[in-house]
Curated annotation (Swiss-Prot):
This is Myosin-7. SUPFAM superfamilies: Myosin rod fragments, P-loop containing nucleoside triphosphate hydrolases. ATP binds at residues 178-185. Myosins are actin-based motor molecules with ATPase activity essential for muscle contraction. Forms regular bipolar thick filaments that, together with actin thin filaments, constitute the fundamental contractile unit of skeletal and cardiac muscle. Residues 1907-1935 are annotated as: Disordered. The modification Phosphoserine is found at residues 1137, 1269, 1510. Residues 781-810 form the IQ domain. The gene is MYH7.
Length: 1935
C-alpha cells in the first residue's frame, strides 16, 4: 500500500505505516550481516553492536554506545537486514529472537506506530498520549479490509473477526490481555465502538426503545461507564485500571446487524473495598458520590463530602488529576438511565455503597475483664442499618455475638475485636461483590433484546500474567488463568500454522504445543494438585497455612518438575514455594490462603441481610447457603457440609466455562504492553517490555514459530528478488514457471536443503535462512557493482588517455610549424611574399563583390517570386482546409447515419431471432410442461403408495418397539428377582449343569435349523415381494395405458379432422417421404437406446432398493446393540448406586465411630470428593461407550472392576479405622496413599469389576436358561396362536373389502363404457350438424355474391340502354334540322340507327329476360336461405343443447372418474395390505413349523434325560401335557405346511408364466407408447416449424405483394372503371375465401392465410397481364359470369339435396371448433403480433436500405472530392519539391557567397570594413528571410501531409461504406433464400402429416392388440389371486 493508498486514513496515516521515503532510506542504510548483532546488556537487556573479533568461542563487540564487551558466542544474536526495519508482522523477521522483537517494537513505538502483528498476535504499546487513529475516518478506512490490505490496528482485528463471522458462519472471540495500565480497557472500548458503528441496527431499535432508554448501540457503549464506576480504580501504573476481567459477547443477526449483548465478569478485586496502598485508591464510585455533584445523594446516604471521614476509602489517595469525579458521576448516572435502571434500583445501589462507607467507621472495644468485643458507639451502625434496611441492634448483636450451630443446636459465640473487624470487612466485601455481580446481571437483562441472534463476537478483557515480589493467592488464580489461555493460544496458533503447511502440501509431523503447558496446569487443577489440596485443607478446622505447605511439599516436591522450593533472598518478602510457568518462575507466599479461599461470612448477619427491607440487599443474599445450611429432603447426608463453594472452586468453574466458550469460537489475540512505569510518552523501558513479552506469550509464540517455517514468500516475488544469486539457473529468453524457477534457483545454491520447503503457492523457510539469502544477495550485488565501477573507471581512464595523446600530437604539429616559421620569417623573399599576397587578394575580392551584387539582385527577384508563390499557396491551403473540414463533416455524418442504419439492422435481426427463439421456446416449454405434468402425476401416485407403505412400516416398527420395551422391562424385573434368588439357586445350578450342556447342544442345533429355515423363508419372501411389486407396476402401467388410450382416441379424432383438411396438399408432400422414413429409423434407433438406458436405470434402482433394505436391517441391528449397551449401562449405574450407598454407610459408621470431630468431617469430605471424581470418570466412560460399541464394552468392564476393587479397599480401610482408632491420624495418611494407588490402578480395578460382572451374569444365565427354554416355547406358541387368529380375521376383512371393491369397479367400468358410447354418439351427431351448418353458410355466401354480381350487370345494361336512347334523340333532332341537305345521309344513318336500335332492343330484351330469371332465382334463393336460416337456428339450438348436455356429461364423467380412481387406489392399497399380510402369514407359519420341529427335538431329548431332570419336572409342572398338545398342533401344521407348499409352488409357477407374458406385453406396450409419443412430438415440432416457416413466407410474400400492388396500380390507372369493378369482385372473393377458411381450416389457420396471400398474388399477376388486353378480359368476365350463374343454379339444387348431410357435418365441425378454438385464437394473436413486428421490421429494413443508398451516393461524392484533393495535393507536392530545389540552390549560393566573403575580408581588411558590414547585415537579413521561408515551407509540407493522410482516411471510410452496403444486400438475398426454404419446409410438413397419419393407424391397431393382451393378463392375475385366497381360506378353515 503506497502513500496514495494510505491517504484514505487521513491524519492517521503517519501513525499506521511508514512512508515510501522512510522505507527507501531504511533499505539504503549501511549494513553488514556478519558483523551487526545484538549482545546482552545488564540495563538494556540487549543492545546493538558490531563484532570486532572472534576467539575461542567468545566474541568481542563494540556496542552502539561505544562500549567494548566480550560475550559467549551463543549469546550473540544477528540483526535483521534493513528491509525488515519496522516490519508490521514480526513473524516475518528472518532472525526471530527476543532482541529482534524488542527493537522492532521499540523502533515502531518511536515512530508512534503502536500496533504490530506477531503472527496471530496483535501487540499494542500504550502511547500515553492521544493519537488520531480512532476517528470515524479510520473506522471507514478499515471496514471490509483484509488483514494484509491495511496496517496493523485493533480495528483490523475487529473487522476481520466480523467478516469471518459473516463468511464462515462461526462465532468469534477477541482476547485482550496485558498488565494494568497497558491499555486493555481502551482497546476493549475501541472494539465495541467499531462493532457499534459497522453493525448498527438503525431505526429498528429506536422504534422499540422505551422512554428513557437508548438504542442497543448506546446501551452497549454505556455499559462501560457503569462497569468502570464500580469496577475500576486508580493503581500505581494506571489511573483507570480495571480490577476485574470481563468477557463481553456481542450477538449479531444472520445479516450482521446487532441483536443483543451480554457480559461475564471474573476475579473482581474485592479486597480493594476495604484496603488500598498509599499510591492507589478505592473504586471510583465512592469518590464520585462524594464529589457533591448531586447533593441529594449526600443527604440520602447520610454522608459528608470529605473522603477522609471514611476509613475504608481513605487509606491511599483520594483524588486523581486525570479524572473529574463530578463529571464521571453524571456519566455513571446517565449510563444507568440509558441502560434502563429504575430510580429505585439506582438509589438502592447508592445506599449500599454508602452503607459500606459507614461500615468502615464502626468501632468496637473489649469488655472489661473479658476478651469479648462490644460496640464503641452506635451512630455509624445506626446509619448503616438504616441504609441497609436492618435493625441496628440486631446488626451489632450479630457482629459481636453471632450464633453458631454445634451439633443440632445453635449457641451464641463471643467474638474479640479483631474477629469482629475482620467480619465487618468480609461483610462489606461480600455486599460490594454481590452488588457488582447483580449490576452485571441487570445490564445483561437490558442488553438481551427479543431480536433473533445467530452469531456472537466475544471480547475478553482480563489481566495478564503477574510476577511481583510478593505473589499471593490472587496472583496464582490470574497466572493459572493465563496459563490456560496461553495453552489455548499455543494449540490454536500452531494448529492454524500446521493447517497452512497441510494446505500448501508440505510434509509435516503434527506437534501439539498445547501440551507443553499441561504439566503446570495439572499441577494446579488436577486431583491432589495445589487447588485440590487447598480445598481439602479448608475442610479441616484445625488446618493452617503451614499444614497446607507441608502437604504441598509432601505431594509435589521432587515429584513434579514444575514445583520447586524457593530461594529466599534478603530484602525480599518470604516465599513458600515456586512454580515454573511458561512466563518464568514465580515465588508464592501462602499466608492467608486458607482464609481467602474459604472467604467465611458472619452467617447471623447474612440472615439479617436476607430479611432486609431493602429489596436489593435481600435479593443479593437470597441464595446464600453456608456450611451449616439445612439439608434438603431427599438428598441424604452426602450434601452435609458441602453446600458452600470455595473461591478456588468457583474460579475453576468460571474458568472452565470461559474456556468452553472460547473453544467454540475462532479466536483473535491482542497483547497490550506497558512501555514504562512513569507514564512517559515515547519512552520504552527494555527490561519491563521484555518481562511482559515473556509473560503474555509473544516470545512463546516466537518459540513455536521457530520450530516451523516462519518465513514464506510467493514464488513470483522470490524469483524476482533472488534471481540475481544465480541468473544461469533461470535463463532470460525462455519461459519457466515461477515454482520451477524457484526450485532450480534454490537447488543451485550452496545452502542446507532441509531449511526450506516448497508449497503450492509459496516457498517456506526456516528461521534465519532468509537472512542468509539476503546476505548472499548483498554480496552478489556488491560484486556486480564493484565490477561495473571497475569497468566504468577503465573506460573513463582510456578516454582521458586518448585526449592526452591527441593533445600531444596537436602540440607537436604547432611546435613544428612555429619552428619552421621562425626559420624562414627573416628571408627576403618571405618578406616580399608577405607584402604582395594581400594585394592579390584585394583584386580577386573586387571581382567577387561584383559577382555577388549580381547574384544578390537575382536572389532578391527570386525571393519576391517565391513570396508571391507562397501567398498563393497559403490562400489555396486555406481553401483546401475549408473543403477538407466540410468533407470531414460530411463523412462524419455519413458514418453516423451508416452506424445508425447498421445498428437498427442488427437490432431488427436480433429482435427477429429473439422472437423466433421465444416462439420455439414457448412451444418447447408447453411440451415440457405437459410431459412434466404427466410425470409428476405418476410420481405423485407412486409417492402416495410409498408413503402409505412407509406409514405401515412405521406402525409395525412402533409396535415392535413397544414389544421390545415391554420385554425389556420384563427382563429387568426378572433380573431383579433372579438376583434376589441367586443365593438359593446356587445349589440348583450345580445339579442342572449337566442338563444345561445337553440343552445347549440341542438349542444350538435348533438354532442352526431355525436359521436355515429363516434363510429359505427370506428368499421366498423376497421372490414373492418382487413378483407382487411387478404385478403392482403392471397394474399401474395398465391404468396409465388406459388413460393414454383415451388421450390417443381424442388425438385420433382430432387427427381425422385434420386429415380432411390436409388431403388437398397430400400429393405435394409425397416427394420427401423417403427422407422422413430415414429420420424415423434414426429416431427408432435412438428410442431403443433410450429404452436400454431406462432398463439399466431401473436395474440400478432395484439394486439401490436392495441396498437400502440391507442398510435398514443393519440399522435395526445397531439399535439392538445400542439397547443392549444401554441395559448394561443401567446395570453399571445400579452397581454404582449400590457402591455409593455402601460408601455412605461406611461414612456413617466412621461418623458414629469418631463422633462429630473435625477429622471425621474431613474424611467425609474427602470420601465425597473421591466419590464425585469417580462419578465424573464413570460418566466420561459412559459417554465413550455410546461412541463405539467395542470401547463401550471394554470400559464397562474396567469401570465395574474398578468399583469392585474400590469396595474391597474401602472395606479394608473401614476395618483399619475400627481397629486402630487411637492411631487415626497415621491411618488417615495411609488411606490417602491408598487412594492415590487406587487412582493409579484404575484400569486393573475396572478389569476385576468386569470379571465380577461376568461371573454374576453366568450365575444368572444358569438360573434362567432352564426356565426360559420351556417358558419361551409356551409363550411363543400362545403368541403365535393369537397372532394367527388376528391375522386370519384381518385377512378375511381385507378379502371381503377386495371383493366389494372389485364389484364396485366392474359396475363403474360398465357405466363408464356406456357413458363413453353415448358421448361418442353425441359427438358424432354434433359434428355432422356443425358441418352441415358450415356448408350451408358457405353456399349462402356464394349465392349472395352471385346475386350481387347479376344486379351490377343489370345496372350496367340499363346504363347502356339509356345511353343508346339519348343517342337516338340526338340523331332525331339532327335529322329534323338537316332533313333537306342530308336526306341520303339520314337514310343511311336511319338504317344504321335502326339496325343498332334493333340490336339494343334485342340486348335489352335479353337483359330483361336475364333479369327476370335472376329475380326468380333471387326469390327462390331468398326462400331457401330463409329455410336454411331456420334450419341453422334449429341446429344452433340443438348444438347448444348438446353442448350443455355434453358439459353435464363431462362433469358426471369426471366425478365417476375421480370415484373410480379413488376406488382403484383403495383397491391397490388393500391388495398391498393383503399381500403383506399373506407374506407375514407365511412367515409366521414357517416360524410356527420350525418351533414345532424344535419342540419335537426337545421332546426326544427330554425322554432321554427323564431320569436326570426329576427335580425339574416338579418345577415345570405341566410341561409334559403342553408338549403333547404342541405335538398335535405340530402335526396339523405340518400337514398344512405341505398343502401350502404345494399351493405356493403352483402359484409361483403360474406367476412366473404370467410374469413372462406381462413383461412381454409391457415391453411391447412401452415400445408402442414410446413410438407414439416420439411421433407425436415430431409431429408437434414439425407443425411448429411449419408455422414459423409460414410466418416467414407470409412476410416475404407481403413484400412481393406490395411491389405487385404498385405495378398493378400503375396499370389500373388506364381503366379506372374496370379496376373498380375488379377490386370489388376481388374484395368479395377474398371475403368469401376468409369465411370459408375460418369455417373449414381453423387448425391450419396460418396455412390458409398463406394460401389466401398466394391467391391474392396470383390474382394481382393475372390482373397485370389481363389489363393489357382490356376488351378480351371484359368479354371473358361476362362469359364466366354467365357460366357461374348456371353453375350457381345447379349448386342451389345440389345444396337442397345435401342439406341433411350438412347438418351432420355441422355437428362435427362445431366440436372441432370448440376443441381448436383456444389454440387458434392464441396462434392468431401471435400471428397478428408477429405480422405487426415483421411489417415494422420490413419498413425499418427499407429505411436502412434507403439510407445505405444515400450513404453510397455520398461516398461517391466523397471519392470524387478526394480525387480532386489528391490532384491538388500532387500539385502542392510538385511546388514543394520546386521550393526545396530552390532552397538547396540558395544554400549553395550562400555557401559560395560566404566563401567569397571570407576572401574579401582578407583582401579588404583595411578599406572595406563599412562595405563589409553592410554586406554582412544584408546577408543576415537574407538568412533570416531564408529561415522564415524554410519554416513556412515546412509548415506547408506538414499541412500537405495531414491533408494526404486525411484523404487516405476518407478513401478507406468510403471503401468500408461500400462493403457495408454489399453486406446489407447479401443479407437481403439470404433472407429471401430463407423465405423460399421455409416454403419448401411447409410443403414437407404437410407431406409428413400424411405419413404420420398412416403410422398412427398402424400404432392404433397395435395399441388395440396390446390392450387385449393386457386384459387377458389382468384376468389371469385375478384368477391367481382368487386361487391364492381360496388356498388361504382353506388353510385357515383346517386350522
Amino acid at each position: 500500500m503506497g502513500d496514495s493508498e494510505m491517504a484514505v486514513f487521513g491524519a492517521a496515516a503517519p501513525y499506521l505505516r511508514k512512508s515510501e521515503k522512510e522505507r527507501l532510506e531504511a533499505q539504503t542504510r549501511p549494513f553488514d550481516l556478519k558483523k551487526d548483532v545484538f549482545v546482552p546488556d545488564d540495563k538494556q537487556e540487549f543492545v546493538k553492536a558490531k563484532i570486532v573479533s572472534r576467539e575461542g568461542g567468545k566474541v568481542t563487540a563494540e556496542t552502539e554506545y561505544g562500549k567494548t564487551v566480550t560475550v559467549k558466542e551463543d549469546q550473540v544474536m544477528q540483526q535483521n537486514p534493513p528491509k525488515f526495519d519496522k516490519i508490521e508482522d514480526m513473524a516475518m523477521l528472518t532472525f526471530l529472537h527476543e532482541p529482534a522483537v524488542l527493537y522492532n517494537l521499540k523502533d515502531r513505538y518511536g515512530s508512534w506506530m503502536i500496533y504490530t502483528y506477531s503472527g496471530l498476535f496483535c501487540v499494542t504499546v500504550n502511547p500515553y498520549k492521544w493519537l488520531p487513529v480512532y476517528t470515524p475516518e479510520v473506522v471507514a478506512a478499515y471496514r471490509g479490509k483484509k488483514r494484509s490490505e491495511a496496517p496493523p490496528h485493533i480495528f483490523s482485528i475487529s473487522d476481520n473477526a466480523y467478516q469471518y463471522m459473516l463468511t464462515d458462519r462461526e462465532n468469534q472471540s477477541i482476547l485482550i490481555t496485558g498488565e494494568s495500565g497497558a491499555g486493555k480497557t481502551v482497546n476493549t472500548k475501541r472494539v465495541i465502538q467499531y462493532f457499534a458503528v459497522i453493525a448498527a441496527i438503525g431505526d429498528r431499535s429506536k422504534k422499540d426503545q422505551s422512554p428513557g432508554k437508548g438504542t442497543l448501540e448506546d446501551q452497549i457503549i454505556q455499559a462501560n461507564p457503569a462497569l468502570e464506576a464500580f469496577g475500576n480504580a486508580k493503581t500505581v501504573r494506571n489511573d483507570n485500571s480495571s480490577r476485574f476481567g470481563k468477557f463481553i459477547r456481542i450477538h449479531f443477526g444472520a445479516t450482521g446487524k446487532l441483536a443483543s449483548a451480554d457480559i461475564e465478569t471474573y476475579l473482581l478485586e474485592k479486597s480493594r473495598v476495604i484496603f488500598q496502598l498509599k499510591a492507589e485508591r478505592d473504586y471510583h464510585i465512592f469518590y464520585q458520590i462524594l464529589s457533591n455533584k448531586k447533593p441529594e445523594l449526600l443527604d440520602m446516604l447520610l454522608i459528608t463530602n470529605n473522603p477522609y471521614d471514611y476509613a475504608f476509602i481513605s487509606q491511599g489517595e483520594t483524588t486523581v488529576a486525570s479524572i473529574d469525579d463530578a463529571e464521571e458521576l453524571m456519566a455513571t448516572d446517565n449510563a444507568f438511565d440509558v441502560l434502563g435502571f429504575t430510580s429505585e434500583e439506582k438509589n438502592s445501589m447508592y445506599k449500599l455503597t454508602g452503607a459500606i462507607m459507614h461500615f468502615g467507621n464502626m468501632k468496637f472495644k473489649l469488655k472489661q475483664r473479658e476478651e469479648q468485643a462490644e460496640p464503641d458507639g452506635t451512630e455509624e451502625a445506626d446509619k448503616s442499618a438504616y441504609l441497609m434496611g436492618l435493625n441496628s441492634a440486631d446488626l451489632l448483636k450479630g457482629l459481636c455475638h453471632p450464633r453458631v450451630k454445634v451439633g443440632n443446636e445453635y449457641v451464641t459465640k463471643g467474638q474479640n475485636v479483631q474477629q469482629v473487624i475482620y467480619a465487618t470487612g468480609a461483610l462489606a466485601k461480600a455486599v460490594y461483590e454481590r452488588m457488582f455481580n447483580w449490576m452485571v446481571t441487570r445490564i445483561n437483562a437490558t442488553l438481551e433484546t427479543k431480536q433473533p441472534r445467530q452469531y456472537f463476537i466475544g471480547v475478553l478483557d482480563i489481566a495478564g500474567f503477574e510476577i511481583f515480589d510478593f505473589n499471593s493467592f490472587e496472583q496464582l488464580c490470574i497466572n493459572f488463568t493465563n496459563e490456560k489461555l496461553q495453552q489455548f493460544f499455543n494449540h490454536h496458533m500452531f494448529v492454524l500454522e500446521q493447517e497452512e503447511y497441510k494446505k500448501e502440501g508440505i510434509e509435516w509431523t503434527f506437534i501439539d504445543f498445547g501440551m507443553d503447558l499441561q504439566a503446570c496446569i495439572d499441577l494446579i487443577e488436577k486431583p491432589m494438585g495445589i487447588m485440590s489440596i487447598l480445598e481439602e485443607e479448608c475442610m479441616f478446622p484445625k488446618a493452617t497455612d503451614m499444614t497446607f505447605k507441608a502437604k504441598l511439599f509432601d505431594n509435589h516436591l521432587g515429584k513434579s518438575a514444575n514445583f520447586q522450593k524457593p530461594r529466599n533472598i534478603k530484602g525480599k518478602p518470604e516465599a513458600h514455594f515456586s512454580l515454573i510457568h511458561y512466563a518464568g518462575i514465580v515465588d508464592y507466599n501462602i499466608i492467608g490462603w486458607l482464609q481467602k479461599n474459604k472467604d467465611p461470612l458472619n452467617e447471623t448477619v447474612v440472615g439479617l441481610y436476607q430479611k432486609s427491607s431493602l429489596k436489593l440487599l435481600s435479593t443479593l443474599f437470597a441464595n446464600y447457603a453456608g456450611a451449616d445450611a439445612p439439608i434438603e429432603k431427599g438428598k441424604g447426608k452426602a450434601k452435609k457440609g458441602s453446600s458452600f463453594q470455595t473461591v478456588s472452586a468457583l474460579h475453576r468453574e468460571n474458568l472452565n466455562k470461559l474456556m468452553t466458550n472460547l473453544r467454540s469460537t475462532h479466536p483473535h489475540f491482542v497483547r497490550c504492553i506497558i512501555p514504562n512505569e512513569t507514564k512517559s510518552p515515547g519512552v520504552m523501558d527494555n527490561p519491563l517490555v521484555m518481562h511482559q513479552l515473556r509473560c503474555n506469550g509473544v516470545l512463546e509464540g516466537i518459540r513455536i514459530c521457530r520450530k516451523g517455517f516462519p518465513n514464506r514468500i510467493l514464488y513470483g516475488d522470490f524469483r524476482q528478488r533472488y534471481r540475481i544469486l544465480n541468473p544461469a539457473a533461470i535463463p532470460e529468453g525462455q519461459f519457466i514457471d515461477s515454482r520451477k524457477g524457484a526450485e532450480k534457483l534454490l537447488s543451485s545454491l550452496d545452502i542446507d536443503h532441509n531449511q526450506y520447503k516448497f508449497g503450492h503457492t509459496k516457498v517456506f523457510f526456516k528461521a534465519g535462512l532468509l537472512g542468509l539469502l539476503e546476505e548472499m544477495r548483498d554480496e552478489r550485488l556488491s560484486r556486480i557493482i564493484t565490477r561495473i565501477q571497475a569497468q566504468s573507471r577503465g573506460v573513463l581512464a582510456r578516454m582521458e588517455y586518448k585526449k592526452l595523446l591527441e593533445r600531444r600530437d596537436s602540440l607537436l604539429v604547432i611546435q613544428w610549424n612555429i619552428r619552421a616559421f621562425m626559420g624562414v620569417k627573416n628571408w627576403p623573399w618571405m618578406k616580399l611574399y608577405f607584402k604582395i599576397k594581400p594585394l592579390l587578394k584585394s583584386a580577386e575580392r573586387e571581382k567577387e563583390m561584383a559577382s555577388m551584387k549580381e547574384e544578390f539582385t537575382r536572389l532578391k527577384e527570386a525571393l519576391e517570386k517565391s513570396e508571391a508563390r507562397r501567398k498563393e499557396l497559403e490562400e489555396k491551403m486555406v481553401s483546401l482546409l475549408q473543403e477538407k473540414n466540410d468533407l470531414q463533416l460530411q463523412v462524419q455524418a455519413e458514418q453516423d447515419n451508416l452506424a445508425d442504419a447498421e445498428e437498427r439492422c442488427d437490432q431488427l435481426i436480433k429482435n427477429k431471432i429473439q422472437l423466433e427463439a421465444k416462439v420455439k421456446e414457448m412451444n418447447e416449454r408447453l411440451e415440457d410442461e405437459e410431459e412434466m405434468n404427466a410425470e409428476l402425476t405418476a410420481k405423485k401416485r407412486k409417492l402416495e403408495d410409498e408413503c402409505s407403505e412407509l406409514k405401515r412400516d412405521i406402525d409395525d416398527l412402533e409396535l415392535t418397539l413397544a414389544k421390545v420395551e415391554k420385554e425389556k422391562h420384563a427382563t429387568e424385573n426378572k433380573v431383579k428377582n433372579l438376583t434376589e434368588e441367586m443365593a438359593g439357586l446356587d445349589e440348583i445350578i450345580a445339579k442342572l449343569t449337566k442338563e444345561k450342556k445337553a440343552l445347549q447342544e440341542a438349542h444350538q442345533q435348533a438354532l442352526d435349523d431355525l436359521q436355515a429355515e429363516e434363510d429359505k423363508v427370506n428368499t421366498l419372501t423376497k421372490a414373492k415381494v418382487k413378483l407382487e411389486q411387478q404385478v403392482d407396476d403392471l397394474e399401474g402401467s395398465l391404468e396409465q395405458e388406459k388413460k393414454v388410450r383415451m388421450d390417443l382416441e381424442r388425438a385420433k379424432r382430432k387427427l381425422e379432422g385434420d386429415l380432411k383438411l390436409t388431403q388437398e396438399s397430400i400429393m405435394d408432400l409425397e416427394n420427401d417421404k423417403q427422407q422422413l422414413d430415414e429420420r424415423l429409423k434414426k429416431k427408432d434407433f435412438e428410442l431403443n437406446a433410450l429404452n436400454a438406458r431406462i432398463e439399466d436405470e431401473q436395474a440400478l434402482g432395484s439394486q439401490l432398493q436392495k441396498k437400502l433394505k440391507e442398510l435398514q436391517a443393519r440399522i435395526e441391528e445397531l439399535e439392538e446393540e445400542l439397547e443392549a449397551e444401554r441395559t448394561a449401562r443401567a446395570k453399571v449405574e445400579k452397581l454404582r448406586s449400590d457402591l455409593s450407598r455402601e460408601l455412605e454407610e461406611i461414612s456413617e459408621r466412621l461418623e458414629e465411630a469418631g463422633g462429630a470431630t473435625s477429622v471425621q468431617i474431613e474424611m467425609n469430605k474427602k470420601r465425597e470428593a473421591e466419590f464425585q471424581k469417580m462419578r465424573r470418570d464413570l460418566e466420561e466412560a459412559t459417554l465413550q461407550h455410546e461412541a463405539t460399541a467395542a470401547a463401550l464394552r471394554k470400559k464397562h468392564a474396567d469401570s465395574v472392576a474398578e468399583l469392585g476393587e474400590q469396595i474391597d479397599n474401602l472395606q479394608r480401610v473401614k476395618q483399619k479405622l475400627e481397629k486402630e482408632k487411637s492411631e487415626f491420624k497415621l491411618e488417615l495418611d495411609d488411606v490417602t496413599s491408598n487412594m492415590e494407588q487406587i487412582i493409579k490402578a484404575k484400569a486393573n480395578l475396572e478389569k476385576m469389576c468386569r470379571t465380577l460382572e461376568d461371573q454374576m451374569n453366568e450365575h444368572r444365565s444358569k438360573a434362567e436358561e432352564t426356565q426360559r427354554s420351556v417358558n419361551d416355547l409356551t409363550s411363543q406358541r400362545a403368541k403365535l396362536q393369537t397372532e394367527n387368529g388376528e391375522l386370519s380375521r384381518q385377512l378375511d376383512e381385507k378379502e371381503a373389502l377386495i371383493s366389494q371393491l372389485t364389484r364396485g369397479k366392474l359396475t363403474y367400468t360398465q357405466q363408464l363404457e356406456d357413458l363413453k358410447r353415448q358421448l361418442e354418439e353425441e359427438v358424432k351427431a354434433k359434428n355432422a350438424l356443425a358441418h352441415a351448418l358450415q356448408s350451408a353458410r358457405h353456399d349462402c355466401d356464394l349465392l349472395r355474391e352471385q346475386y350481387e354480381e347479376e344486379t351490377e350487370a343489370k345496372a350496367e345494361l340499363q346504363r347502356v340502354l339509356s345511353k343508346a336512347n339519348s343517342e337516338v334523340a340526338q340523331w332525331r333532332t339532327k335529322y329534323e334540322t338537316d332533313a333537306i341537305q342530308r336526306t341520303e345521309e339520314l337514310e343511311e344513318a336511319k338504317k344504321k340507327l335502326a339496325q343498332r336500335l334493333q340490336e339494343a332492343e334485342e340486348a335489352v330484351e335479353a337483359v330483361n329476360a336475364k333479369c327476370s330469371s335472376l329475380e326468380k332465382t333471387k326469390h327462390r334463393l331468398q326462400n331457401e336461405i330463409e329455410d336454411l336460416m331456420v334450419d341453422v337456428e334449429r341446429s344452433n339450438a340443438a348444438a347448444a343443447a348438446l353442448d350443455k348436455k355434453q358439459r353435464n356429461f363431462d362433469k358426471i364423467l369426471a366425478e365417476w372418474k375421480q370415484k373410480y380412481e379413488e376406488s382403484q387406489s383403495e383397491l391397490e392399497s388393500s391388495q398391498k395390505e393383503a399381500r403383506s399380510l399373506s407374506t407375514e402369514l407365511f412367515k409366521l407359519k414357517n416360524a410356527y413349523e420350525e418351533s414345532l420341529e424344535h419342540l419335537e427335538t426337545f421332546k426326544r431329548e427330554n425322554k432321554n434325560l427323564q431320569e436326570e431332570i426329576s427335580d425339574l419336572t416338579e418345577q415345570l409342572g405341566s410341561s409334559g401335557k403342553t408338549i403333547h398338545e404342541l405335538e398335535k398342533v405340530r402335526k396339523q401344521l405340518e400337514a398344512e405346511k405341505m398343502e401350502l407348499q404345494s399351493a405356493l409352488e403352483e402359484a409361483e409357477a403360474s406367476l412366473e408364466h404370467e410374469e413372462g407374458k406381462i413383461l412381454r406385453a409391457q415391453l411391447e406396450f412401452n415400445q408402442i407408447k414410446a413410438e407414439i409419443e416420439r411421433k407425436l412430438a415430431e409431429k408437434d415440432e414439425e407443425m411448429e416449424q411449419a408455422k414459423r416457416n409460414h410466418l416467414r413466407v407470409v412476410d416475404s410474400l407481403q413484400t412481393s405483394l406490395d411491389a405487385e400492388t404498385r405495378s398493378r396500380n400503375e396499370a389500373l390507372r388506364v381503366k379506372k372503371k374496370m379496376e373498380g369493378d375488379l377490386n370489388e369482385m376481388e374484395i368479395q372473393l377474398s371475403h368469401a375465401n376468409r369465411m370459408a377458411a375460418e369455417a373449414q381450416k381453423q387448425v391450419k389457420s396460418l396455412q390458409s392465410l398463406l394460401k389466401d396471400t398466394q391467391i391474392q398474388l396470383d390474382d394481382a399477376v393475372r390482373a397485370n397481364d389481363d389489363l393489357k388486353e382490356n376488351i378480351a378480359i371484359v368479354e371473358r368476365r361476362n362469359n364466366l359470369l354467365q357460366a357461374e350463374l348456371e353453375e350457381l343454379r345447379a349448386v342451389v339444387e345440389q345444396t337442397e339435396r345435401s342439406r341433411k348431410l350438412a347438418e351432420q357435418e355441422l355437428i362435427e365441425t362445431s366440436e372441432r371448433v370448440q376443441l381448436l378454438h383456444s389454440q387458434n385464437t392464441s396462434l392468431i394473436n401471435q400471428k397478428k403480433k408477429m405480422d405487426a413486428d415483421l411489417s415494422q421490421l420490413q419498413t425499418e429494413v427499407e429505411e436502412a436500405v434507403q439510407e445505405c443508398r444515400n450513404a453510397e451516393e455520398k461516398a461517391k461524392k466523397a471519392i470524387t472530392d478526394a480525387a480532386m484533393m489528391a490532384e491538388e495535393l500532387k500539385k502542392e507536392q510538385d511546388t514543394s519539391a520546386h521550393l526545396e530545389r530552390m532552397k538547396k540552390n540558395m544554400e549553395q549560393t550562400i555557401k559560395d557567397l560566404q566563401h567569397r566573403l571570407d576572401e574579401a575580408e582578407q583582401i579588404a581588411l583595411k578599406g572595406g570594413k563599412k562595405q563589409l558590414q553592410k554586406l554582412e547585415a544584408r546577408v543576415r537579413e537574407l538568412e533570416n528571410e531564408l529561415e522564415a521561408e524554410q519554416k513556412r515551407n515546412a509548415e506547408s509540407v506538414k499541412g500537405m501531409r495531414k491533408s494526404e493522410r486525411r484523404i487516405k482516411e476518407l478513401t478507406y471510410q468510403t471503401e468500408e461504406d461500400r462493403k457495408n452496403l454489399l453486406r446489407l444486400q447479401d443479407l437481403v438475398d439470404k433472407l429471401q433464400l430463407k423465405v423460399k426454404a421455409y416454403k419448401r419446409q411447409a410443403e414437407e410438413a404437410e407431406e409428413q402429416a400424411n405419413t404420420n397419419l398412416s403410422k398412427f393407424r398402424k400404432v392404433q391397431h397395435e395399441l388395440d392388440e396390446a390392450e387385449e393382451r393386457a386384459d387377458i393378463a389382468e384376468s389371469q392375475v385375478n384368477k391367481l389371486r382368487a386361487k391364492s385366497r381360496d388356498i388361504g381360506t382353506k388353510g385357515l378353515n383346517e386350522e
